[in-house]
Amino acid sequence: MAASALRGLPVAGGGESSESEDDGWEIGYLDRTSQKLKRLLPIEEKKEKFKKAMTIGDVSLVQELLDSGISVDSNFQYGWTPLMYAASVANAELVRVLLDRGANASFEKDKQSILITACSAHGSEEQILKCVELLLSRNADPNVACRRLMTPIMYAARDGHTQVVALLVAHGAEVNTQDENGYTALTWAARQGHKNIVLKLLELGANKMLQTKDGKMPSEIAKRNKHHEIFNLLSFTLNPLEGKLQQLTKEDTICKILTTDSDREKDHIFSSYTAFGDLEVFLHGLGLEHMTDLLKERDITLRHLLTMREDEFTKNGITSKDQQKILAALKELQVEEIQFGELSEETKLEISGDEFLNFLLKLNKQCGHLITAVQNVITELPVNSQKITLEWASPQNFTSVCEELVNNVEDLSEKVCKLKDLIQKLQNERENDPTHIQLREEVSTWNSRILKRTAITICGFGFLLFICKLTFQRK
């Protein structure tokens, strides 16, 4: 058959393996003609065509075969139904068609529900979210657990699907349920390093004090897996977000967390999630989330907040208690600014050697802090754009700032080299100057050494004379 008659892409089905291929999801290409199914086919042939249509995601052929009498809940390999397979590959269109034809959204096979299959599917979060919302709209239970006692929200938290987590909670998912190892959804998010999911779960009432069966809290799990930011977030805050949305009704929670997709005519009502920005993350980490609206109203960015003076805090309505928390965080960051402009001209000209040395040491220390900070950002920055969950501006803005940083670093390097050459020149001139007058400190040090040696010598002679005198008296 000509290659042009071939359609579709091969897609792997299911999450298990078997030596038997007689009743499996066949991987391959489906030969489709433009004609409808006009003649009756043997039931086995229809099933084979149905499997192939499901495999390549051919929605039209699936509908035709269902019209011809194929059961929407047919059992295939491993006892899976077509709906479970469609959910496993996050094919939202197939899920919609099968549900509209009466497929059972609450079907389970070996304690594996279709909702769990959708939450653990390999696909984009957008498609997974659509599948999950379709299943929940058909009364799929969000709290049914698998054999390992893991619920759908645990799978979503483990795989980093923030929007799916929010949607499940909005439909009644329990956030503090524990699996066979004592892991909660929060523990899974901390283990995998999903910071935004950690923040959202705390807001939705997750208990960060629940321990695993080996006695580990989520913060300790995060630390063990080297997610230090999440460790700090869970360890050093009083969990001000806990239970913030627990008292809301289901409808209010959905409105609070989710926003509806504008394309209602084509798609089912799907949801989007508003991610945290850097300011919100900083404030939540300090337990100051109540300041978010205040700072946004005054157009105060995180960078502005970190450089505020005490009078600016008061002017912007920030209480002294909140000021102390922010200043303590800044002290931990060890970011200190050298105020050269505050030095008088006379001080600049007559600065002592000790003061100049302290200045150089402080400057070097700050450079070290900057290097460490940049290295930490490089380590934590996701290499895959799909993993970025915070609100980011255009990447072009970041690259332009980085270019300015590179230029400033090069300029700083040039200035430091000039300073080094100047100091070396002064040192050489001083060593070669025959009229150089010794510093008072050096003279005083030399004089003190002479006095000490003289005093010791006199005491020694005196002690020797005293012994000789005693000896003569005895004789």
UniProtKB/Swiss-Prot annotation:
GO cellular component: cytoplasm; pi-body
Record has Phosphoprotein as a keyword: yes
Keywords carried by this UniProt record: ANK repeat, Cytoplasm, Developmental protein, Differentiation, Meiosis, Phosphoprotein, Repeat, RNA-mediated gene silencing, Spermatogenesis
Record-linked PROSITE patterns: ANK_REP_REGION, ANK_REPEAT
Compartmental location: Cytoplasm
The keyword Transcription regulation appears for this protein: no
UniProt-listed Gene3D superfamilies: Ankyrin repeat-containing domain, Transcription Factor, Ets-1
Transmembrane parts of this sequence: none
Any one GO BP annotation for this protein: male meiotic nuclear division
Every SAM domain range: 272-334
Any single Pfam family the record assigns to this protein: Ank
Tissue expression remark: Expressed exclusively in the testis and ovary and at higher levels in the adult testis compared with the adult ovary.
First and last residues of every ANK repeat: 45-74, 78-107, 110-144, 148-177, 181-210, 214-243
Sequence segments annotated as region (Disordered): 1-25
Function: Plays a central role during spermatogenesis by repressing transposable elements and preventing their mobilization, which is essential for the germline integrity. Acts via the piRNA metabolic process, which mediates the repression of transposable elements during meiosis by forming complexes composed of piRNAs and Piwi proteins and governs the methylation and subsequent repression of transposons. Its association with pi-bodies suggests a participation in the primary piRNAs metabolic process.
Subunit structure: Interacts with DDX4, PIWIL1, RANBP9 and TDRD1.
Name of the molecule in the record: Ankyrin repeat, SAM and basic leucine zipper domain-containing protein 1
Name of the gene encoding the protein in the UniProt record: ASZ1
